[in-house]
Amino acid sequence: MATPFFHVDFEQPNEMRFNRARVRRAFIHIGQRHMRDARRLVMRRGRSEPGENPGYQSGRLAKSIGFMVPRASKNRPGFMTRIAPNQRNGQGNRLITGDFYPAFLFYGVRGGAKRRRSHHRGASGGSGWRLAPRNNFMVETLKINSPWTRYYLARELRLSLKPEKRR
């Protein structure tokens, strides 16, 4: 007795059409969402404690956070998003002039924190920090948005691949 065998054959198009504009729009949307969430993390008013996200006083840090999707070139397809404070050529940001303030927040400042004449912060003369390091809010934003970013980018890549129309 012969084994049952069923075979369906169909022609598959050789070429797939890739919609670059759709993928670039997806990266722009990802940049906008990450920028929004990073700004929300630093918008809490009031004084911040060491290890917390930076507090909001003048709004310069929050307004400086921007994103950029680079243009495509012969060496680079342009499928990436840069999100950072003081992002050059960034969209939706105002640059911070002077010293790079986010670096002071991340690394902290010890200079000028020695015990001086006005050492009434405690018996030891303070903590040794003029500005203690704060939380890295950009890394926290990336962690929060990581599952959504993967899902959204995979969906847009899938939808941007279409088979070429036969004529």
Language-model-detected regions and their locations in the chain:
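Short, Lys/Arg-rich flexible segments
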Residues: 1-94, 100-167
